[in-house]
Swiss-Prot record:
It comes from Escherichia coli (strain K12). It is a multi-pass membrane protein. Part of the ABC transporter FtsEX involved in cellular division. Important for assembly or stability of the septal ring. Encoded in an operon consisting of genes ftsY, ftsE and ftsX. It comes from the Bacteria. GO terms for cellular component: ATPase complex; cell division site; division septum; divisome complex; Gram-negative-bacterium-type cell wall; membrane; plasma membrane; plasma membrane protein complex. This is Cell division protein FtsX. Residues 96-223, 297-322 are periplasmic. Gene3D superfamilies: 3.30.70.3040. Residues 19-48 are annotated as: Disordered. Overexpression leads to strong inhibition of growth, cell filamentation and eventually cell death. PANTHER family: CELL DIVISION PROTEIN FTSX (PTHR47755:SF1). The chain crosses the membrane at residues 75-95, 224-244, 276-296, 323-343. Keywords: Cell cycle, Cell division, Cell inner membrane, Cell membrane, Membrane, Transmembrane, Transmembrane helix.
Amino acid sequence: MNKRDAINHIRQFGGRLDRFRKSVGGSGDGGRNAPKRAKSSPKPVNRKTNVFNEQVRYAFHGALQDLKSKPFATFLTVMVIAISLTLPSVCYMVYKNVNQAATQYYPSPQITVYLQKTLDDDAAAGVVAQLQAEQGVEKVNYLSREDALGEFRNWSGFGGALDMLEENPLPAVAVVIPKLDFQGTESLNTLRDRITQINGIDEVRMDDSWFARLAALTGLVGRVSAMIGVLMVAAVFLVIGNSVRLSIFARRDSINVQKLIGATDGFILRPFLYGGALLGFSGALLSLILSEILVLRLSSAVAEVAQVFGTKFDINGLSFDECLLLLLVCSMIGWVAAWLATVQHLRHFTPE
């Protein structure tokens, strides 16, 4: 930096410093020519608050000016952040809607219990009572041998063949519906093992094949969403950190002047922190807009597919709480990335 550039930077910073002093302490002459006022008790707390507010305003204004000075580069950075955040947001919405569809359209898993044919009605009622008393059982639907035969006759259409039989070949059936807390794979297996030990039970079958497939599918979608989210958060962190680093190098002459006249690291650091937070917030806001556009475009297609299957399903986007959380998290990521990039530069910076 030559002598003329240094003088220009000092003049610019001196003008900003004068405006800062005027806004905080009144006129620029330190109050020497101001009319005398009645003495009053000092208010150091209010003065400190005014100084802090003015520093925040100055730093925020500097961050905005820095972003506005290079609009194309800022736009590209925000677009990269938005696209990086849109992918995990869409994956999360897919995971959330798959869970909603599973809850809405799939029944709870059931355990079918076949009783021994030698049991009479009283013994069968005792077995059903034991099933109902088991931990984790919500409800037991009992079907006697006669009811099972009548239902099979109506369903199969082999009424004539069944009439030729001398005795009823079907056993009594008890359908056990577990509680919501016992609908996991391990809990169902434990409940099935306990039911098998009850006297009077011939066979136990667990109708959870579809449930296991659905749980595996939703778990896979959730893990993929989490992995993509972690990678995209790292990408956003690197993008914001690199953008702030380039901004620091572009303003190294101004930082040099500020260091020479005694500016603290916190004063130099604050505009870059606000700039990183603004980049994260803007990218997250644009990501929410892109995600909502994608939901609106896919809603009609999903509705048509659901209509073909004779049902109705609506895609749910991100809720207000989820949108607010995304904005806050991305702003914090931008803040931390800018802090790391700026601190690393100031640590090795030597005024010239």
